[in-house]
Amino acid sequence: MSTRVLTLTLLKKRHLMQCFWSTVGSVHLRSIASDKIPSHAVEASLYVHWPYCLKRCSYCNFNKYISRSENHDTMTECLQKETETLLKLSQVSRITSVFFGGGTPSLAQPSTIAAVLETVTKNSNLSDLAEVTLEVNPTPAGKARLKDFTLAGVNRFSIGVQSLNADHLRILGRDHSVQHALQTVSEARKLCPGRVSVDIMFALPGQSVSCWQKQLEELLYVCDDHISLYQLTLERGTQLFKQVESGKLSVPGDEVTAIMYKTACRVLEESGFHQYEVSNFARNNAVSEHNMGYWRGHQYIGVGPGAHGRFVPHGDGGVQREARTQTLEPDVWIKEVQSRGRGTRRRITLHHLQLLEEVLVMGLRMNEGITHQHWELFSPEANLQQVFGKSANIQELQGGRFLILDDRGLRCSWEGLVLLDSILPTILLELEMFFHSRGIKRTQ
């Protein structure tokens, strides 16, 4: 199998993973593996969604609402109430990390962040060393609040730089300048040295490989120890999608996009960054502990309008993990939380084969892949060699040096990571065929 046969589909924006999780589900260490409650069943991470933005970027179709006259006190009370309700429902005793995303959570009051964290500590154990991340829009207003956010309990920032090119920022509809971005990163590094991540996008309209490499080199002069790369995604219905569809703008093709991605990997590696996941790079071991929890299949609780969660509702007598989606519209969500403690719009019980699919989809994103020990926690009845070892399709992927199955486990090669979205359907089909041969269907 050659790279020409495979269609390049790189990782899109981080938030889009949540859309995928809502259909595939997430991993739960089931009682099939042990009669005892495993450690992951009593701990989880927490995602808190702030839905408001000052404006909508031209490429964004995520769940966000233009800030008007939202009541910060009401939002704070509801975020606290839903956090308490879902913590009690999950019965987790330890929160391993907290991530405030959006929307633009740097628009929230620092007192709101402090209040949510206080609720967490009252209802579970949150270590003083736990990672607490806040996404920041690098505007002067966002920069001015950084210190107050650290006083509220934030110890890691994720800065949405997106580009260091003024024309690209304008095309993307961003409300910050290159100078604003650089100043915000610098201030964040002073407050949280070694714990500042920068988001940057590639495959932008009119962007060349040389322009992209120049931006990366400029970024390396100012960034901290974590960088996330995101390929521009043209989402139907967005302003940017319409501009490209009409021919007013053009984006790089697949081959150029692939070169951009490989260029980034090379440039970052030469600067001491280790690629630990498809789109994430860290040096000095500054990985995102919160995101590692997602990729390793740990439980997580989603709070706020449109947030997604994956946990076992032990408080309701549940024994299987559920995929949960909170109500999208902030006003409706607020009313639901005020009336019944939570605004959960959808609950889906996740079955065994769905869980194994999630182990593969999320685990193969990581450079470390899936170890035999990790797989056994979810599938004690069939190990990786039994499921994939005799498959001609898997052997072809191994022969093409895209996939590795050995005594360590199952993982992608460097080329395989680049083409992950293209080879995943083959891997998932083999998983389904194996379990169907044993009489296990996807919804059992």
Curated annotation (Swiss-Prot):
CDD domains: Radical_SAM (cd01335). S-adenosyl-L-methionine 1 binds at residues 47, 102, 135. Pfam families: HemN_C (PF06969), Radical_SAM (PF04055). Residues 1-39 form a transit peptide. Keywords: 4Fe-4S, Chaperone, Heme, Iron, Iron-sulfur, Metal-binding, Mitochondrion, S-adenosyl-L-methionine, Transit peptide. InterPro entries: Aldolase_TIM (IPR013785), Coproporphyrinogen-III_oxidase (IPR034505), Elp3/MiaA/NifB-like_rSAM (IPR006638), HemN_C (IPR010723), HemW-like (IPR004559), rSAM (IPR007197). [4Fe-4S] cluster binds at residues 53, 57, 60. One of its GO terms (biological process) is porphyrin-containing compound biosynthetic process. SMART domains: Elp3. GO terms for molecular function: 4 iron, 4 sulfur cluster binding; coproporphyrinogen oxidase activity; metal ion binding. PANTHER family: COPROPORPHYRINIGEN III OXIDASE, RADICAL S-ADENOSYL METHIONINE DOMAIN-CONTAINING PROTEIN 1, MITOCHONDRIAL. Might carry two S-adenosyl-L-methionine binding sites with only one binding to the iron-sulfur cluster. Belongs to the anaerobic coproporphyrinogen-III oxidase family. HemW subfamily. This is Radical S-adenosyl methionine domain-containing protein 1, mitochondrial. The lineage of its organism: Eukaryota, Metazoa, Chordata, Craniata, Vertebrata. The gene is rsad1.
